[in-house]
């Protein structure tokens, strides 16, 4: 059949077996087929003249998968026979991916005598790419007017922050002895190599304030559990940080430790000085400062300024609802009900998020309004590109090339940014019977405020949920696997409910069912029966408390028991459940509990009023 021949053709092309591909009989013309074969061919192509074909393909198909591999392939084919102007033109559109390509760019700039761009290219290579001993020596010798001792140190500093041992040591001949001592101390601390004290002693006093050394000492102490000793280093940290994310990870660990010790004043001081400027870590740091000020230092006014500033600078529904809900709580605690109500109303607009839903309750509303499906927007730019990827995915599924089809749909999802672009992806995913890819696309769209409720919250038939509420099962499955029955995590958790084989085996034994590991990913009912049974045992253990059972499903009951001991039991009146969730020490579990609970609110709404899911 055509399908089998097409399947064979793609298999040969994936392997780069062009002789067998040429020998295929009856390979009828098909537009999708020809384009996929061309794409696969260009990825493997080693002939010089295919450079132009790759450049054309990239220009005409901006959203195709594995764009970077195609760019790297083109870089390989940029031969010295090409005119320098062509080479420079290429790199002005595609920054070099490999060290070798970077050298080709530099050579072309030399030939055309473009000194300004040459200097930029040399510095960018020097500061961002892994180089051999020979390449380093060559650059230092040839470009010593640009690669000054200070620039040489900047490269070593970058390699040390990355933790690259060999590449750092390759730089030793080019730096001073004192800088070598500093580098050695940083590497020893970073990789827990031992003999750190003598290594630090060898660093001269004027270099001991080096950001990287302070950071590695701080992190080393925290890893060794020396939290008090680590804290001494926080008070004279540089105001400008090169790698703010790394600093925040350590600072957050210290703040959480202080909260555990009920040392709220110091925790607040450390949180206030977080120095984050943007992105996810800014949102987390700014929120933490506000929350500690409000809940543990009784400073509602100060807290509200943190939350309002956070609201202005974050973009995702999860962060905006979190900032506005807590701003409402801060104004409420400061006896300013009208302003508090205003902020709860802002938060409640984000009705698919945990804090948006809590704000809705704060406003005394029992009904939960889900976002309406948007009308088709005018921003349809790029929709034809996306539709093409979807049609190719459908074609690939029909000929039995599912893995490749998934790659095309996921790439389409990552590039889609409007309703008109996301809509065909969801239809395509449902058409090829991969609802988990529709969930994937719909969830990505929701971050941009584009909602597809029924695709985002599927309700497949469930046979046996062991008396556990269906809405809860769906909520866990959505967070665990996005409804992908074949999901497998890097830790080895399997299937819809992401069961660890050992857990699944003991549950099967208690239910007197035969245990079959393969069935965890091949039979979704089997996976749900075991997962629901395990979940039910957790709900019983925690006397009906969903938040505790959900936390235990993610982090294990031994951790939840530890947290109950430490922070109290949120099922009792004197312990605030929201604070309890926010005090969970593991970021992954905090996020997990909030995401499952927000799913639960939506699923209950969809199950009780099926019409709202249109």
Predicted regions located by residue number:
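N-terminal leader/linker segments that initiate helical-solenoid repeat arrays
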Residues: 1-40, 369-389, 398
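The tetratricopeptide repeat
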Residues: 4, 37, 70, 101, ...
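Structural register within alpha-helical repeat arrays
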Residues: 8, 38-41, 74, 105, ...
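Residue at a conserved register position within TPR or TPR-like alpha-solenoid repeats
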Residues: 12, 45, 78, 109, ...
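Structural motif corresponding to the intra-repeat A-B loop/turn of tetratricopeptide repeats
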Residues: 15, 44, 48, 77, ...
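Alpha-helical positions within canonical tetratricopeptide repeat
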Residues: 19-20, 49, 53, 66-69, ...
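Solenoid-like repeat scaffolds
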Residues: 22-32, 43-46, 55-65, 76-79, ...
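Catalytic glycan-binding domains that act on GlcNAc-containing polysaccharides
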Residues: 30-32, 39, 54-61, 201, ...
């Amino acid at each position: 059949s055509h399908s089998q021949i097409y399947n064979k053709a793609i298999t040969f092309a994936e392997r780069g077996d062009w002789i067998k591909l040429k020998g295929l009989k009856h390979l009828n013309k098909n537009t999708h087929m020809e384009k996929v074969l061309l794409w696969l061919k260009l990825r493997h192509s080693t002939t010089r003249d295919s450079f132009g074909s790759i450049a054309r393909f990239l220009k005409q198909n901006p959203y195709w998968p594995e764009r970077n591999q195609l760019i790297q392939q083109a870089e390989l084919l940029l031969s010295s026979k090409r005119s320098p102007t062509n080479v420079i033109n290429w790199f002005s559109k595609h920054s070099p991916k490999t060290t070798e390509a970077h050298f080709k760019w530099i050579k072309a700039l030399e030939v055309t005598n473009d000194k300004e761009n040459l200097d930029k290219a040399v510095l960018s290579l020097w500061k961002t790419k892994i180089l051999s001993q020979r390449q380093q020596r060559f650059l230092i010798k040839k470009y010593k007017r640009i690669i000054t001792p200070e620039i040489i140190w900047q490269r070593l500093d970058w390699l040390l922050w990355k933790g690259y041992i060999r590449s750092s040591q390759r730089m030793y001949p080019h730096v001073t002895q004192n800088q070598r001592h500093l580098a050695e101390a940083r590497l020893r601390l970073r990789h827990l190599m031992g003999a750190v004290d003598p290594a630090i002693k060898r660093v001269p006093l004027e270099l001991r304030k080096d950001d990287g050394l302070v950071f590695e000492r701080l992190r080393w102490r925290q890893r060794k559990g020396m939290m008090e000793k680590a804290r001494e280093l926080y008070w004279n940290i540089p105001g400008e940080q090169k790698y703010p994310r790394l600093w925040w990870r350590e600072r957050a660990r210290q703040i959480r430790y202080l909260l555990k010790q009920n040392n709220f004043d110091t925790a607040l001081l450390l949180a206030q000085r977080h120095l984050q400027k943007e992105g996810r870590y800014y949102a987390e740091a700014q929120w933490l400062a506000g929350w500690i000020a409000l809940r543990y230092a009784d400073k509602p006014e100060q807290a509200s300024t943190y939350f309002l500033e956070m609201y202005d600078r974050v973009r995702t529904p999860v962060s905006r609802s979190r900032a506005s809900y807590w701003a409402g709580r801060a104004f409420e605690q400061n006896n300013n009900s009208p302003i508090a109500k205003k902020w709860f109303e802002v938060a409640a607009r984000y009705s698919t998020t945990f804090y948006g839903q809590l704000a809705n309750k704060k406003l005394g509303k029992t009904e939960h309004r889900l976002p309406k499906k948007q009308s088709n927007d005018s921003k349809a730019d790029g929709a034809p590109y996306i539709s093409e990827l979807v049609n190719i995915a459908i074609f690939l599924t029909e000929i039995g090339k599912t893995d490749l089809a998934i790659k095309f749909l996921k790439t389409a999802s990552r590039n889609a940014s409007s309703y008109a672009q996301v809509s065909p992806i969801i239809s395509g995913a449902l058409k090829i019977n991969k609802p988990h890819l529709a969930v994937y696309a719909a969830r990505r769209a929701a971050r941009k405020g584009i909602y597809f409720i029924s695709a985002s919250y599927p309700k497949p038939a469930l046979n046996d949920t062991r008396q556990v509420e269906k809405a809860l099962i769906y909520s866990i499955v959505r967070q665990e696997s996005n409804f992908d029955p074949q999901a497998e995590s890097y830790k080895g958790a399997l299937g819809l409910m992401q069961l660890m084989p050992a857990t699944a085996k003991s549950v099967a034994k208690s239910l007197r069912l035969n245990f079959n590991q393969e069935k965890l990913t091949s039979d979704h009912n089997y996976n749900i029966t075991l997962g629901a049974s395990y979940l039910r045992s957790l709900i019983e253990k925690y006397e009906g408390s969903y938040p505790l059972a959900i936390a235990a499903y993610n982090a294990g009951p031994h951790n939840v028991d530890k947290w109950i001991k430490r922070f109290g039991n949120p099922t009792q009146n004197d312990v605030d459940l929201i604070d309890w969730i926010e005090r969970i020490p593991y970021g992954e579990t905090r996020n997990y509990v909030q995401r499952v609970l927000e799913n639960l609110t939506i699923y209950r709404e969809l199950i009780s009023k099926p019409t709202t899911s249109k």
